[in-house]
């Protein structure tokens, strides 16, 4: 019997059974998934719900007609708005509506105050309010400022009017009353100052004595006032009204004249002070071993009080040859003394002209004479920096013609410092006889004496 069955009929039966099974299925609708399909660890990427994936048929994004509401897995307190606000009623306005109402009432209360201020400044009679109330707001719109309310004047006095506006008619004053109310006090001060510039420009003689600002010199005829610091026999203060193009030339011509009349001590650097005090006839010559000293930064010559003289020099009498000499001064060698040879510094000791008699001495050597300003340009700190080095000695001599000549003794050999006699014997200007014991003099005292002696020599030469 099995062999008699047709295979085609068996295939047809199988197809019919499958179709019947499909028909017997329930229609597509919301159905609860089996418990084994729900997995809280899974999350759908389409809808964001937990318990299924994006491929699952439970996803509401795939079946819009029968979308399932994702059930909450647990209570989420604090995230959901369980107590929403009740709808507001107009009878019970909130705090925001109250603030808006107060802001609307404030400008209405300020309107009468603005009207009173406008009436006080302008002097106009108060306008009658219209029945609809539109005219009052339009008239005061130009006075409203966004920055803040109008200033309230507590005093009953009327505002002070500038003198420039005093000559105008009363109609113009009443029209510009509101403009003056908005002007700041600084603006009024500038107007008053500009109005008072007219009569001041006419005063030429009195303007020279009164202190004027720098802007006043830019007029048509500026006043040039030249006031030298010290009185001069030739002329004094002059007031010359000239054009603005000649002022610079006169100032440049007047400044050097005022500087030439100043004394040599008034806060000037050392080279000009030395040239004024020593004069043109002074000549400073040094010994054969001396070289041109290196110039240091110029320092102002300040007069210090005289200090008590220190102990005498330790110079043996047998080492000095010849007649009377000036007091030799101890000098510390500069930093380059070992390489460049001996050099001079302004810490030189000498005696006053009254103590040093004029005696015939040997003529000075034909060495190039250094200017007198060179001695003052040396730094005073170079000598104090080398305490362990051997001191240098300079001899000052008074010649017959009233000039001074100085000679620098040769530096001693550093190998035998115990023999000062051999060191002094090498100098061609050393004499055999010795004067009274020499004492050390501060350099400030010596420089002051040198200025006095040179000024006396200049006066003697002028008398001759």
UniProtKB/Swiss-Prot annotation:
Organism superkingdom: Eukaryota
Compositional bias annotation for Basic and acidic residues: 74-89, 97-114
Short name of one Pfam family: zf-CCHC_6
Biased composition (Low complexity): 180-197
Record region (Disordered): 1-42, 70-387, 415-437
PANTHER family in alphabetical order: FAMILY WITH SEQUENCE SIMILARITY 90 MEMBER A11, PSEUDOGENE-RELATED, PROTEIN FAM90A1
Family: Belongs to the FAM90 family.
Name of the protein described by the UniProt record: Protein FAM90A18
Source organism of the structure: Homo sapiens (Human)
Biological classification of the source: Eukaryota, Metazoa, Chordata, Craniata, Vertebrata
Gene: FAM90A18
């Amino acid at each position: 019997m099995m062999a008699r069955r047709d295979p085609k009929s068996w295939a047809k039966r199988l197809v019919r059974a499958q179709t019947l099974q499909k028909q017997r299925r329930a229609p597509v609708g919301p159905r609860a998934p089996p418990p084994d399909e729900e997995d809280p660890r899974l999350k759908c990427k389409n809808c964001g719900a937990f318990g299924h994936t994006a491929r699952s048929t439970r996803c509401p994004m795939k079946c819009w007609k029968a979308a399932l509401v994702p059930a909450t897995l647990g209570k989420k307190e604090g995230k959901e708005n369980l107590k929403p606000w009740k709808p507001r009623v107009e009878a019970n306005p909130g705090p925001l509506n109250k603030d808006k109402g107060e802001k609307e009432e404030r400008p209405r209360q300020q309107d009468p105050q603005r009207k009173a201020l406008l009436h006080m400044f302008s002097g106009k009679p108060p306008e009658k309010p219209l029945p609809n109330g539109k005219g009052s707001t339009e008239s005061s719109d130009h006075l409203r400022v966004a920055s803040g309310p109008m200033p309230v004047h507590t005093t009953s006095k009327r505002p002070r009017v500038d003198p420039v506006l005093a000559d105008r008619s009363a109609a113009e004053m009443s029209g510009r009353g509101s403009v003056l109310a908005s002007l700041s006090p600084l603006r009024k001060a500038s107007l008053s100052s500009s109005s008072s510039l007219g009569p001041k420009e006419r005063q030429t003689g009195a303007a020279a004595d009164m202190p004027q600002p720098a802007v006043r010199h830019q007029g048509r005829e500026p006043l040039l006032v030249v006031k030298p610091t010290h009185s001069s026999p030739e002329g004094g203060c002059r007031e010359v009204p000239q054009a603005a193009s000649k002022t610079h030339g006169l100032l440049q011509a007047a400044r050097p004249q005022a500087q030439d009349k100043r004394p040599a001590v008034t806060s000037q650097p050392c080279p000009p002070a030395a040239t004024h005090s020593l004069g043109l006839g002074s000549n400073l010559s040094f010994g054969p071993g001396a070289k041109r000293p290196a110039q240091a930064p110029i320092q102002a010559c300040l007069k210090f009080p005289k200090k008590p003289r220190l102990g005498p020099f330790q110079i043996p009498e047998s080492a000095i040859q010849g007649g009377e000499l000036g007091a030799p001064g101890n000098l510390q060698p500069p930093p380059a003394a070992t390489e460049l040879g001996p050099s001079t510094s302004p810490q030189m000791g000498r005696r006053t002209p009254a103590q040093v008699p004029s005696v015939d001495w040997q003529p000075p050597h034909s060495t190039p004479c250094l200017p007198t300003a060179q001695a003052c340009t040396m730094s005073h700190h170079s000598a104090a920096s080398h305490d362990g080095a051997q001191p240098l000695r300079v001899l000052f001599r008074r010649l017959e013609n009233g000039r001074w000549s100085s000679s620098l003794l040769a530096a001693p050999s550093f190998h035998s410092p115990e023999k000062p006699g051999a060191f002094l014997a090498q100098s061609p200007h050393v004499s055999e006889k010795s004067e009274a014991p020499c004492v050390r003099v501060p350099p400030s005292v010596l420089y002051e004496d040198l200025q006095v002696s040179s000024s006396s020599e200049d006066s003697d030469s002028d008398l001759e």
